[in-house]
Amino acid sequence: MISSVFPALPVATPFLGAGLLGATQSLGRRRLAEAIAIATAVAATVLCAIDLVLAIRHGDAVTWFGGWQPRHGVAIGVSFTIDPLGAGLATFVGLLTIAALVFSWRHFESVGHVFPALLLVFMAAMMGFSLSGDIFNLFVFFELMSIAGIGLTCHRPDEGAPLQGALNFAITNAIGGFLVLIGIALLYGRTGALNLAQIGAMLDGHRADGLVLVSFGLIVSGFFVKAAVVPFHFWLADAYATAPTPVCILFAGVMSELGLYAVARIYWVVYAGTLGSHQEALRTILLTAGALTALLGATMCFLQRHLKRMLAFATISYVGCFLVGIALLDSGGLAGTAIYVVADGLVKASLFICVGVLQHRCSRVDERHLHGLGRNLPFTGIVFFVGALALAGLPPFGSFLGKSTIEDAALARGYWWVPALFTVAEIITSAAVVRAAGRVFLGWGPRDASGPAGEDRADEETSQEIEGRNDRTPALLWLPAAILLLAGLAVGLVPGVDRVAQAAAARFVDRQGYIAAVLHARPPATLPPVSVSGPSLADYLYAAGSSLGALLLGLGALLLPRHAHDSPSVIFRRARAAAGWIRGLHSGHPGDYVAWVTAGTAILAGAFALTLR
């Protein structure tokens, strides 16, 4: 184990950079502010990467601020604990922040230094969230993420749509934060501790009483709000639709996934010792939530015409897939989820940048209004189309490697339906993006500007993000999209990625090793060698089915005769009615969303109380 102040530097660096931007604001030089922000993000990412390498080679690194180290297993101080998965997630945050800052080089003349400073604060909060070993600091970074995210969403407070999206974001995530805080308070009342390792050690071996179960339900519900798990997901599409493209890169690429990371970290360190005998019941609850999220997100994605909303619901669908991987409660599912999160985040970030390019050139993001307008953007069209197939798990993209690892872990536990679930969700989600690519970049399909109720608000949610002339696309806009897509491909091609992920996941779920490293400064015991078999023939067949199914469904929906949509067939009529009902649930009213969060919390906590005692 390595103990030093170095692991904290990645979080301190963005805060210092944001402060420097504030100090130089009087100079009024926008390019200087952007250069400082990019340099700061690069420095913090390099520091995170060093932390990651050190954690892989030498074991977990623990930093105790102010030198307040534990005595006799009692932790009073605040710590950062760097393990491979946490450091890897923080590094991924840094990479996406760099991409967002590069893309935003020509953004927001009117807000000056505010936008890059907020992005750096957002980055620092996400990195701190990934590295924190203290449950209350998790909450602090959770709230800081929300505050910075709200400010970034409402980048134009004089416009109604960004303000509404930020309001939905603020209200829903504030309730999520409140749930987490109450859950932490209950845990503190039971254990008198805030350090994750110490809480886990104190609960280990004891039967979970009502207080512990209620705290678990509240904490999981609160972080499910951030992750946008159904039915806590309603705020997300409104925020994505109105947030600027650079912010969407971070929202879709990593912010939602951080909510799932928190659930995994807190479960394995804090609750696994006391809930270990109820793993099967917990799997059932979490798998159900993951499957529902994957299918509803995919369905809503296919119903969208607003490209940002489409990708927002794609994010929700894949959050469901990630939750399924975590819900298996073993290192194999967690390793697959880690790979899947990185690869999918890179691809979705690339797709959002493509949408940003379209918004720059055409000032629109509705696929019907963009009909054929992307013909003069062939490179962007290629990236967008390949990205759509990558969402379907096309080999050799990293998303294929990640989902096949989860599927193998699920089959090993007898969950035969998980590969089918992933295939259906990927087909529907990818088909929506394929349909949009054909309509926008090839001009296929009917030129129909009318759409389902509630879908014609795309223009009022869209503003001109990039100032200046828009008759050409600067390389700084489209180049990050290509690089991110290639990075998503590289995740699946680099030798040994699955082996590193499996080893990191095995250390993540080794709660006794984590507790020993944090509370007693002892290196964790050597884990048995990781066995990695790689994707099987069945995995490739599922991937081929997903990719082919997405192409057929996407092109079929695009080329279906217009009169078929108005068919009097009972099947079509019922499908339209069901689609209208599902869309109607996403009303955009904060009161409705609060009601769903309340209902979801009651259902989840009730399920825990009934099955985990």
Predicted segments with their positions:
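Transmembrane helix-loop-helix hairpins at membrane boundaries of multipass inner-membrane proteins
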Residues: 1-8, 16-119, 197-201, 555-559, ...
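Helical transmembrane-bundle signal
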Residues: 11-21, 41-51, 90-101, 123-126, ...
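Cytoplasmic/organellar membrane-interface segments at the starts of transmembrane helices
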Residues: 243, 374-380, 430-547, 565-603
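Juxtamembrane boundary at the C-terminal end of a transmembrane helix
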Residues: 500, 606-613
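Membrane-helix interface motif
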Residues: 53-61, 186-196, 264-272, 391-406, ...
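Hydrophobic transmembrane alpha-helices and their helix-loop junctions in integral membrane proteins
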Residues: 99-109, 113, 123-138, 148-461
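Hydrophobic alpha-helical transmembrane segments
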Residues: 77-93, 208-223, 419-426, 521-553, ...
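Hydrophobic alpha-helical transmembrane segments of polytopic
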Residues: 7-17, 33-47, 86-93, 115-122, ...
